[in-house]
Amino acid sequence: WRQFTYNQGQSGRGVFAGGFSNPLYHSIISYIQIPTTGNALNFGDLTTNAGFAPAVSNGVRAVWGSRYTGSGNNTMDYVTIPSQGNAIDFGNSTGSLWSRGGFSSSTRGIFFGGNPTSNVIEYIEIATIGDALDFGDIMSSRRDAAGLASATRGILSGGQPGIGANYTRIESITIASKGNSIRFGESTMGSMAMAGASNSTRGIFAGGTTVPTLDGNNTIEFVTISSEGNAVDFGDLTQKTYRFNAMSTGTRVVFAHGTTGPSGTGLLNTMDYINISSQGNATDFGDKIFAYGEYSGSGTSDSHGGLGGF
């Protein structure tokens, strides 16, 4: 077994970045303090205006992966979470994909899937600036899947194959060992563009949408990360939303809402939260700096479940 130690420097800060409000993509990075309620504050800017840039963190550094800037862009950039400021170039992704999912441990960041529809898994060593490397493949190509992790296992759920119905399959990988994903269980939702977050034992997936209507949903479900099996209903978000993100500590998940349906006709500035250990509906947390969407998976924190010890 492996022992994990909580780092008192981890304050519960969540960061999220990029997004779209007609007619522009944005570079804004926002931050919140997850243990308290309140509105998001300005942190700095990404190196590009972007949407759909997945985020990973080792507790000190947050890295955003390849993104959409009007076309696919393989840029990755990073910030130091305790220090406000603009992002710095980290390296390049293996491809110019967007609408990817991501999760991380205390050392390694994982990005998977993407648009154009892809089955690629790639990884970075978060503490070391450089380009992403091939990790393996997910079971089938998909975009707009959501991810979360414990210190050892990464979980991905949902997504859309490009044409046809959304996926209900949940898959997992062992973060420290390169290789392909394996089947974990089934989602209750079968949604794309969900948000995912976790503590060290319980994973939360929420929201999302289905084709062809692109009408958001408000469902929250959970999995026990160490035990393969199907997701279980947890409760409901305060609003139907998709293409949004989630940030967590060991006790709480905050959702920063994105788009509401049908067909992306509304952009939200709201945030809500749940207590991970207690099933139930979400409660209002505060507001984003302004209303925008199309930033699936772009949130992470200095205290998420992939860091262990919570």
Regions found by a protein language model. Name each.
Residues 1-310:
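Polar, enzyme-active/binding microenvironments
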